[in-house]
Amino acid sequence: ESVTDHNETVKKSLELRGIKIKVKELPIPVAFAAAFEGEIIRKADMHNEMWSSKNPTAELVVMRNLDEITDHKINIIGPDFDQAKDLALATYVEVAGKKMQPDFESVIERKFHAWFNYMEGVMHTGQRNQVRVRVSNAAYDAGLRLKDFAEVLYVMIMDEFDAVVDKCQVTLITDAAEAEKFRDEMAMPRYNARDDRLASMTDESVDRYYTCILCQSFAPAHCCVVTPERLGLCGAVSWLDAKATK
């Protein structure tokens, strides 16, 4: 298999050989580490807020075919942090891979919480369409912008899920009307479909339960037991999500 456009030769060669290039240092203007997880940003120290109680929010990962997306493509639809204080935020990530499965979509979504919190000066809580994100004045002054959020998602997905993800494309929507349309027409139907699938299962119909420690960034001693009929206390991880990552 070959390409006629020689600008695509290296890219195609890596794809055919199954070679993946990993970014060792994130190209963002703030520090990135697990040590910042659990950082609280007070209102007085806040430059921007994306909160579902004020504006539409959603987080969604969708599996695509390899030829349907462009690797490392980043789209920003709407104003950036320097153009508005209170913003909507729809985080839409499209992934493709030979070993990717639909069950992994929600697993990747749940990781957004940790990855955003790893950024110094960023606080993230919630999931799905109930999200709150704050950006501190210090992070904004350092140069943190929406494209950096997208870079974090791309790099971390390609690093932690390299076994199943070959391509990743990120779209961030901060335009309120577009974010609301995305939430209602794209995200909510998919959330409901996942919930309906889980609703048909009972605790007695499975032979294994799972544990979740996602909230240990804020509650270090906490651990949830996840069953088909009982999610983690925060509601972020279902039994199917946990099963997909075992």
Tell me what each language-model feature is.
Residues E1-K246:
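Cysteine-centered metal-binding/redox modules
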